[in-house]
């Protein structure tokens, strides 16, 4: 798709009747959006076909003119898709580029297409259609990522690993349980996507510049033809609204935050010091100087790209925050933010899905790490509550003394002699050792949503039925 950036002055703009001369070259440059909004060509043509069809149905244009318009628009669509369309910066945007080419192809009938329509509702339609399609794509990609985590969770429902708080060993959990935490996160992201699709499922076409139109149009007809639930209800709000774009960016930013947290864990877990996972060669790179290196670049790039998404959200919020109602040219700056964020999110989800599916999990290393750092200390405290009748705060204090003793002796809690434990509290018996293994700790956490393998499998079944 070629782009003509010739800087000669022109007075052939579609709005040029009121002007005696063409715009300055700098004005053309700052005013033009064709460099990025050409991405909307399919939505623009689809909307124009629906609009022309409605105009003919309502008797506003002739069926003959409608047929010429539709044929011409389909020709333009083929030209753009095949790379044989020359975009012109002097024509500003995708709407004017398409209309100018249509005039060349079919003559005066092209001038009837813009009846009862403004670029204000036209761009709102194109952009809304594009965001709706992108949300649908995001929903599918999140479903794939959730499926990847469900598979790993099922595979590792009993694989013990350390659970962390403050990145310090806390309690044993299973890797399957940890995977299911991300299923919950990305499930919420997908739910937000679905709600966003519902929110934007209204057709803006027919709002015209801001006040509606005096032509007897049928907005319900175009809404149905374009796959919307219904038309928007207020023409001023229709051309003012970019909530749908901001909501997309907010959803992308939240999903990006989840992806970034996952990326951070993968980066940490893949270090030799942790050694919990090993990324496949397909999602790793090497060093130009250090032959031994296998770097988690895919995870690091996911972590970085999510920062770009945050920037896009803040940029569009800032663009929109001071605008009076209806259309202002500031709103032209909305699309690049959304396009860039959408591309970043797609790449991040795709890369993370591949990493999760392909990575090798070192269950032996995880289990060994789970047994360090006194991870079963809470189990000792709980045993004292259940078996010795201590209040939890007293049990917490007794356990803290046991941890301090084990630390001073360089051993784990389960390795302390019974005499040492009884010296701390006389109610402790040899039965306490039954709860001090990581396997026993994990198996005991049977509360709803807990880390016990039986609970993890219930949650997997729940999500399998909904994915």
Swiss-Prot record:
Entries under InterPro entries matching the protein: Arg_succ_lyase_C (IPR029419), Argininosuccinate_lyase (IPR009049), Fumarase/histidase_N (IPR024083), Fumarate_lyase_CS (IPR020557), Fumarate_lyase_fam (IPR000362), Fumarate_lyase_N (IPR022761), L-Aspartase-like (IPR008948)
UniProt keyword Cytoplasm present: yes
Recorded catalytic activity of this chain's protein: 2-(N(omega)-L-arginino)succinate = fumarate + L-arginine
Recorded metabolic or biological pathway in which this protein acts: Amino-acid biosynthesis; L-arginine biosynthesis; L-arginine from L-ornithine and carbamoyl phosphate: step 3/3
Gene Ontology molecular-function annotations: argininosuccinate lyase activity
UniProt EC number: 4.3.2.1
Intracellular or extracellular location(s): Cytoplasm
GO cellular component entries: cytosol
Family designation: Belongs to the lyase 1 family. Argininosuccinate lyase subfamily.
Protein name, UniProt field: Argininosuccinate lyase
Organism encoding this protein: Rhizobium etli (strain ATCC 51251 / DSM 11541 / JCM 21823 / NBRC 15573 / CFN 42)
